[in-house]
Every structure is written in C-alpha cells, then in structure tokens.
Regions:
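C-terminal and inter-domain tail/linker signature
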Residues: 1-147
Length: 147
C-alpha cells in the first residue's frame, strides 16, 4: 500500500475511535504486532483499548501531525477525556478521579497489508498521572498535591 493509503486507513481508525467504535482499531493491529519492541498482538491491543475506553468513556483523539513514508507512519496526537472509570494498569488500578486529561504523544507504525505490525509509542506518563491527581505535577504547589 502507498503512504497515502496508509494515512487514509489511520485517519479512518481515529474517526471510528472518536465515535466509540474499537473494532476498526483492532483490525488495524496485526495479530503478531509489537508495542515498543515487546509482543502485544491484537489481543493485547484490544485489552489496552478496552481499558482506556472504560477509564475515559468520552476520550477523543486529535491528530496534530501525520507523516507517512513507505511503510512508516508517524503521528503526533492529542488525547482528551474525563477519568470516569477504573484505569487498570500493570502495577496498580487508579479508581475514577473525575479529572479531565489533555495529553499528547507520538506513535510510529510500520504497516504491512493495511495493518500495524510494529508500534512505537511515547507520551509523558508523569504529566498524565499529574493531571489525574495521582502524583504532583511539576510546578504544582504542596497545597494542591494529592494526599
């Protein structure tokens, strides 16, 4: 597929995610996909998508920048949402805080046959946890920090 076709597929996936439909996103992930060099597969991505959808039922994604070349796709994105459900992570579960988040990150995909086989993703986890009130954000006063 061409770089332009890969961009079009990705934009449709984001559009569907913003409508609350996780299925196209899961079909975009190859059954043997890796995330940050570790095996994840479609089932791992399904779990990740379901956890985020439960924790942030009003989640919205905005594409800030999208670059494609050959089989590579690089995205600078923004995610907003309100923490209304449990956020189950690998170390702990964060109960709903009712706080809004507004984070950005970058993802890079290697695409083959219309599916992401390799995903590299980064965002500022400390900023994310600070916005949830789980940790004190840089510059946040002691009085405003969680107890």
């Amino acid at each position: 597929m061409s770089a332009q076709e890969n961009k079009a597929i990705y934009l449709r996936v984001v559009e569907d995610l913003n409508q609350g439909d996780l299925q196209p996103s899961l079909r975009f992930t190859a059954p043997h996909a890796t995330l940050n060099g570790q095996p994840m597969g479609r089932e791992g991505d399904k779990h990740r998508a379901e956890v985020l959808a439960e924790a942030f039922p009003d989640q919205r994604y905005e594409i800030l920048e999208l670059v494609a070349e050959g089989d590579r796709l690089v995205v600078r994105w923004r995610m907003t949402g309100t923490h209304r459900g449990d956020l189950a992570g690998p170390i702990m579960t964060i109960p709903p805080t009712g706080k809004s988040i507004d984070i950005w990150g970058m993802s890079m995909y290697r695409i083959r046959d219309s599916m992401a086989e390799e995903i590299w993703e980064r965002f500022d986890i400390m900023e994310f946890l600070g916005q949830l009130g789980v940790i004190r954000s840089p510059g946040q006063s002691e009085e405003a920090s969680p107890t």
